[in-house]
Amino acid sequence: MAQRFDRIWQNARLATLGEGRPGLGVIEHGVVASRAGRIAFAGPQSDFAADADAPERIDCEGRWITPGLIDCHTHLVYGGDRAHEFELRLAGASYEEIARAGGGIVSTVAATRAASEAELIASALPRLDALLAEGVTTIEIKSGYGLETATELRQLSAARALGEQRPVSVRTSFLGAHALPVEAGGDKERYIDLVCNEMLPAVAQSGAADAVDAFMETIAFSPEQTSRVFAAAKTLGLPVKLHADQLSNLGGAALAAGFGALSADHLEHTDEVGAVAMARSGTVAVLLPGAYYFIRETQKPPVELFRKHGVKLALATDCNPGSSPLTSLLLTMNMAATLFRMTVDECIAGVTREGARALGLLADTGTLEPGKWCNLAIWDIGRPAELVYRLGFNPLHQRVWRGR
């Protein structure tokens, strides 16, 4: 009896990203077939059943297929913008100076608190659409611009709604420990009490978040305060991830690893102790070259240390209004290659397989393997390096989410 599939993509070149394959896991003469939204076959044409049948067959005409792209660190939902702060930075003000003067995250908090859920969704949709237009099929979206329970929940609800309005998988992270709100009067301990005793239980009860994040930095929260948040999250059964070592080395990478974090992100100032700890815990390093570029950082993340110790490397846009108003994973890959000296294979893996790993989703997406969601990006390119090499050019031919 002939094998039945829903759709078959044939005459394609595949970059499977399978972990058991070298490099990008390339198959020159490949086929992908889907059934019930998942990959039922991904491999050489020669291994595909000659009598296979499907209502729809797509001739890819030699185009490349990669897994759908994954943006594993964004702050996509927020109110207002911070273009005026961009002008201040151009005039010489630093990110820290703007934050300490009441700008930065806190200014976005005011605009986000004033916005309705519908307004938050409407403002985020164009940013999401820009990412989808480049082949993104999975995105992580954080809260963190409410800094009080109602607005944090509203942000998370808006993020979930985006996944209902567009064909994309949305993962949400609660980032209540992002900054200190004005009404806290400088009392970080009391605010962390609020995060742990009120916000986190409300978030967990509502099911609004898939993970808990925090910003551990001299201008944000201490290692001790971050540990309190993570301990509370773990008690509630929520995995954690951390904005770590971006502006200074407070031991964020090692702290994240100690809590078994899915990922530690930024990492410009991480040392070898942190890299070793991440390797042991399986914590993914999420590098954010857009933020490095936009705020004109000079300390690069220690990519060689991560390679040396086998830490997995993911990439993301860090789309946010203050330090990375970026909605292009293609440009993110180019930045990672040119600024951080990452290889083409590392960059492409970083926005597919390793992005999935950073979200705890590798069992379901991130590679072209049977059983995973049929999330594909089909490209008009001659070789995968073009995805990293080109600037301001989008070679996406088709984006497929769950087989459609």
Swiss-Prot record:
One of its GO terms (biological process) is L-histidine catabolic process to glutamate and formamide. InterPro entries: Amidohydro-rel, HutI, Metal-dep_hydrolase_composite, Metal_Hydrolase. 4-imidazolone-5-propanoate binds at R82, Y145, H178, Q246, S323. The keyword Zinc applies. It is an enzyme of class 3 (hydrolase). Zn(2+) binds at H73, H75, H243, D318. Gene3D superfamilies: Metal-dependent hydrolases, Urease, subunit C, domain 1. GO terms for cellular component: cytoplasm. Keywords: Cytoplasm, Histidine metabolism, Hydrolase, Iron, Metal-binding, Zinc. N-formimidoyl-L-glutamate binds at Y145, N320, G322. Its EC number is 3.5.2.7. Pfam families: Amidohydro_1. It comes from the Bacteria. Its cofactor is Zn(2+); Fe(3+). Fe(3+) binds at H73, H75, H243, D318. GO terms for molecular function: imidazolonepropionase activity; iron ion binding; zinc ion binding. Disulfide bonds: none annotated. Binds 1 zinc or iron ion per subunit. CDD domains: Imidazolone-5PH (cd01296). Belongs to the metallo-dependent hydrolases superfamily. HutI family. Catalyzes the hydrolytic cleavage of the carbon-nitrogen bond in imidazolone-5-propanoate to yield N-formimidoyl-L-glutamate. It is the third step in the universal histidine degradation pathway. This is Imidazolonepropionase. It comes from Bradyrhizobium sp. (strain ORS 278).
